[in-house]
Amino acid sequence: MGLSVIILAAGQGKRMASSTPKILHPLGGIPLLERVVNTARLLNPHTIQVVYGNGGSHVREKLNYLPVHWIEQSQPLGTGHAVLQAIPFCQNEDRVLILYGDVPLISPKTLNSLLENTPSNGLGVVVAELPDPTGLGRIIRDDFGNILSIVEHKDAAEHQLKIREINTGIMTTTAMNLKKWLPQLNNNNCQKEYYLTDTVALAVAEGCPVGCVAAQCCEEVQGVNDRWELTKLERYYQRLMAKKLSLAGVTIIDPERFDARGENIEIAPDVVIDVNVILEGNVQLDRNVRIGPNVILKNTTVGENTEIHANSVIEAAVIKANCSVGPFARLRPGSVLEEGAKVGNFVEMKKTTLGRGSKANHLTYLGDTIIGKNVNVGAGTITCNYDGANKWQTKIEDGAFIGSNVALVAPLTVGKNATIGAGSTLSQDAPPDQLTVARERQRTIKGWHRPTKKE
């Protein structure tokens, strides 16, 4: 018996008040639907089917990298109708697991428990008990605690509305059972929809075993219906991430002001992360790294004993051990800092390597530049790498000293141990071991007076 996962993702999401389909909104930097697919993949199913509707081709276009089979529900006729679109693609002997594209934090542990505790020919659901179950389907049990049916909120009688045990929507049974039960569904209800939950009563009527497992917490089965629910779930997720990192030896100064947006975030023990730090995509921080307040790191690796000072923005960079960056530095894609390099305040780098022990401390732009070891780049240095049509490279060899307010018009090379005088504009190579100055000689104009204002 193989496992086939069906993810229902056709909801219109009107309460999101957005032109973006609900399932494409991110939680922790990853679209809701992608999070559910990633969880499903951990169960090793032989197929994952996504039933989509609202957003149509836009959803497929944005998430076309996901290893799923896409099935369109052309009319929003309910969850039962949605599963009916996918079930023909399942083999009769398959165990089918039904998930929801807007329930992003369901855990593999809960799903494995559901699969393991549901009889091979039976039906199992994930339930939860909520203090306020408004709007959710209620679990109806007999006097012995056996599940009899699931009643949607809008169809529930007054005494049933007092029940706090709810249906999360997550369900498993065999494909053969679903192929038998789904055609029997009707839409005689307040919403005129075909409810998947009505299969529970059909199973009970047949004598099919119906069981359940309880969710570990309310948040893992929380659906996203509007932006406020998404915001609350986002903060819950970020607290989980902060707790996980803290227990692994990372100091998070304030978990309420920390954001991890991506699945591949690896942080070694003894790292300190100050407030309002955002980690996006693939981020690796080695031991004893210190991240100052208001820092953004995206797809970046930082070596041990390095400090990133406040208000720095770093994307797709490699920063090796014992470096210092910022405050107010910007490292753009392709930036590499070799061991012991230093980038100071208001320095911007792109496609540039700053060699071992080299430093650019103040007010500098370095683009398409290769800088060797132990180079000093003075304040106000600019590499002029763009001629209006093409980018050109600048090379600064080991030991060079670049004075303040220097413009290096690429392509050119500054030789080993060369010194460039302050205020120079270079458009040709500077030879090694020599002083190169390219500026007009200073003059004093005698007898000159400032103009005076006309009365």
Curated annotation (Swiss-Prot):
What cofactor(s) does the depicted protein rely on? Mg(2+)
Positions binding Mg(2+) in this chain are D102, N225
Write down the chemical reaction(s) this protein catalyses.
Answer: alpha-D-glucosamine 1-phosphate + acetyl-CoA = N-acetyl-alpha-D-glucosamine 1-phosphate + CoA + H(+); N-acetyl-alpha-D-glucosamine 1-phosphate + UTP + H(+) = UDP-N-acetyl-alpha-D-glucosamine + diphosphate
Q: Keywords, A to Z?
A: Acyltransferase, Cell shape, Cell wall biogenesis/degradation, Cytoplasm, Magnesium, Metal-binding, Multifunctional enzyme, Nucleotidyltransferase, Peptidoglycan synthesis, Repeat, Transferase
Give the main location: cytoplasm
- Relate the protein's function as given in its record: Catalyzes the last two sequential reactions in the de novo biosynthetic pathway for UDP-N-acetylglucosamine (UDP-GlcNAc). The C-terminal domain catalyzes the transfer of acetyl group from acetyl coenzyme A to glucosamine-1-phosphate (GlcN-1-P) to produce N-acetylglucosamine-1-phosphate (GlcNAc-1-P), which is converted into UDP-GlcNAc by the transfer of uridine 5-monophosphate (from uridine 5-triphosphate), a reaction catalyzed by the N-terminal domain.
Q: Which family is it part of?
A: In the N-terminal section; belongs to the N-acetylglucosamine-1-phosphate uridyltransferase family.
NCBIfam families found in the cross-reference section: glmU
Descriptive protein name: Bifunctional protein GlmU
Species: Coxiella burnetii (strain CbuG_Q212)
Which gene name belongs to this protein?
glmU
